[in-house]
Amino acid sequence: FSNSRKAEQNQVWVGMAKETAHQLGTPLSSLVAWLEFLRLKGMSSDYTNEIEKDINRLQTITERFSKIGSAPSLTKVNIHEVLKHSVEYIKTRSSDKVIFDLKVPATEVWAPLNVPLFEWVIENILKNAIDAMSGNGKIDVNITNQHQFVYIDICDTGKGIPKSSYKTIFKPGFTTKSRGWGLGLSLSKRIIEEYHDGQIFVKNSEMNKGTTFRIVLKK
């Protein structure tokens, strides 16, 4: 029963992901056309370049959704650069009251990743951290390089997670927010564990003090 139920859930996941990608496709095409129109009308390149960045980001998200359910290709990349890119992206779109601190080892750390999917995970955890801190606090991102494994710890100074919810938060539909589907952490778990053969879990959390998520990857 459990295997058939899991297969059924997988089909639902894949169906939702591909439908989301399909639904995003048409408005994205329109946005690209409108951007060209604004350029022809002489809008400042400062504005159009920022709009283009976000359109490209939407296209990346669409690509991510369309790939759910198929085996992603992994390429050995510098994790420092991937994390830096994700942190910078979220930083420019969050309050000045959120402090980001990325700590990396002196030597580069490389691991096989599907970069778009992995960035999805990091950005999702960072956004959750910002929500948990109500847009005011500090987020530390630390990389530890040990033998055949890489450990990535993302720590916030937010409201914390009760121990009884450490595993529940990774289940589809779980959310403490009034908005959204509560799919972010569940998707993150699938991406790390099923596609990257890694682990993601709550390392520790204290109520009203903060939470640390840990990602473990093989090198």
Please annotate each region the language model reported.
Residues 156:
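Acidic ATP/Mg2+-coordinating residue in the GHKL
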Residues 75-87:
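A conserved beta-strand-to-alpha-helix junction within the catalytic ATP-binding
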Residues 161-173:
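Short conserved segment of the HATPase_c
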Residues 192-193:
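Detector for a conserved hydrophobic position within an alpha-helical segment of the HATPase_c
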Residues 99-109, 146-147:
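Conserved catalytic submotifs in the C-terminal HATPase_c
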Residues 136-148:
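Short beta-strand/loop element within the Bergerat-fold HATPase_c
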Residues 196-204:
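Glycine-rich ATP-binding loops of the HATPase_c
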Residues 17, 184, 188:
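Short alpha-helical Gxxx[C/S/T] motif in the catalytic ATP-binding
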